[in-house]
Each structure stands twice: as structure tokens, then as C-alpha cells.
């Protein structure tokens, strides 16, 4: 707490209370700010260097590897596991892995579409009724709903801005006139 200054603040809502001003707010001159900024940057660089430091491949160094224990006396006792539950869990994992790795092309290959008769719907021959809603028309420039149509090339647009852009760059009818 030696890095901070204690200041007494009086507010109308509360009585006297003590607050601490951090070290960075006490810096008053521009030179002190620059020095403090350099210290912070150098501290960050040193911590990054420490994090990224690696031993060269093949050198073991003088220190022993503390992560590796060669003690055969340490035995870890676990609680007994129901073998039937363990077997069921393994089977579930096998089945999940098999089904999760299939993409659509694999599914089509495994479905043997050529073996089905023509009247049976498959992934390729599936059909649906026409929509009861009218078709949507989208702006050829921005993708919003296009309420207007170009008279020259019958492309859709939604606003005057899109129409101007369409006339400048995309209108096929204006090329021939």
C-alpha cells in the first residue's frame, strides 16, 4: 500500500471517507509518464520472453525433469466400475463416431438410390407442391426486397440509390442502346 496516496473526500451524502489514488494518476510530468510507459512495455516484453522461452532440442540441461516420476511404488486405487455400463458407453461412442463423420455425399452413396423404383421418393427425386405464396423478388444490387423493375433489362431494384448503381454498372439493356 506504499504505492498509493490516501485522500480524504467529503461528499454531502456521506461523512469523511478515505480513498486511494493509484500510482499512474500521481504522475504529473510528461517525462515521468514516458518513463512509466517504457517500464510497463519492458515488463510486458520480459513476461512474453519468459513465456516463449524454450530449450533447444536435444539438450537436457543440468536440472532434472520434475514432471516425470519413476516411482513404481505409487499406485493409484480407483473405485470399481460396472463393466456392463462401461461396455455400453464404449458402444455408444463407436456408433456416434461412425454417424458423425458422414457428409451428404457419403449418405447418398450409402443409400443406394439406383436400387429404388422410380415412384419411390429419394434425395434426388423428391418433389413438393408449389408454394401458396407469391414468389419473392429481391434487389439485384443489395439483396433486399426489390419492389421495382428496370424497364430496359427487367432486373429488380429496391431504391433510387440501387437504381442509379444498376444503371451505371449492371444494366444490360443500356449497353445495346
UniProtKB/Swiss-Prot annotation:
Ligand binding (Zn(2+) 1): 139, 142, 158, 162
Annotated zinc fingers (HIT-type), start-end: 139-171
GO terms under cellular component: Swr1 complex
GO process annotations (BP): chromatin remodeling
Keyword Zinc: yes
Keyword tRNA processing: no
SUPFAM superfamilies registered for this protein in UniProt: HIT/MYND zinc finger-like
GO molecular function: nucleosome binding; zinc ion binding
Segments of this protein annotated with the region Disordered: 1-74
Biased composition (Basic and acidic residues): 27-41
Binding site for Zn(2+) 2: 150, 153, 166, 171
Name of this protein: Zinc finger HIT domain-containing protein 1 homolog
Organism, scientific name: Dictyostelium discoideum (Social amoeba)
Organismal lineage: Eukaryota, Amoebozoa, Evosea, Eumycetozoa, Dictyostelia
Amino acid at each position: 500500500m506504499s504505492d498509493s496516496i490516501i485522500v480524504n473526500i467529503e461528499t454531502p451524502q456521506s461523512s469523511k471517507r478515505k480513498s486511494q489514488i493509484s500510482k499512474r494518476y500521481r504522475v504529473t510530468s510528461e517525462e515521468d509518464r514516458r518513463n512509466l510507459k517504457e517500464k510497463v512495455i519492458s515488463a510486458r516484453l520480459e513476461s512474453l520472453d519468459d513465456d516463449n522461452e524454450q530449450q533447444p532440442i536435444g539438450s537436457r540441461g543440468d536440472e532434472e525433469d520434475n514432471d516425470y516420476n519413476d516411482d513404481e511404488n505409487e499406485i493409484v486405487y480407483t473405485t470399481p466400475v460396472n463393466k456392463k455400463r462401461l461396455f455400453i458407453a464404449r458402444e455408444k461412442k463407436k456408433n456416434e463416431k461412425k454417424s458423425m463423420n458422414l457428409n451428404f455425399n457419403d449418405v447418398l452413396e450409402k443409400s443406394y438410390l439406383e436400387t429404388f423404383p422410380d415412384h419411390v421418393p429419394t434425395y434426388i427425386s423428391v418433389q413438393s407442391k408449389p408454394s401458396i405464396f407469391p414468389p419473392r423478388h429481391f434487389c439485384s444490387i443489395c439483396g433486399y426486397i426489390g419492389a421495382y423493375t428496370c424497364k430496359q433489362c427487367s432486373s429488380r431494384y429496391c431504391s433510387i440509390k440501387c437504381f442509379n448503381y444498376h444503371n451505371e454498372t449492371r444494366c444490360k439493356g443500356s449497353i445495346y442502346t
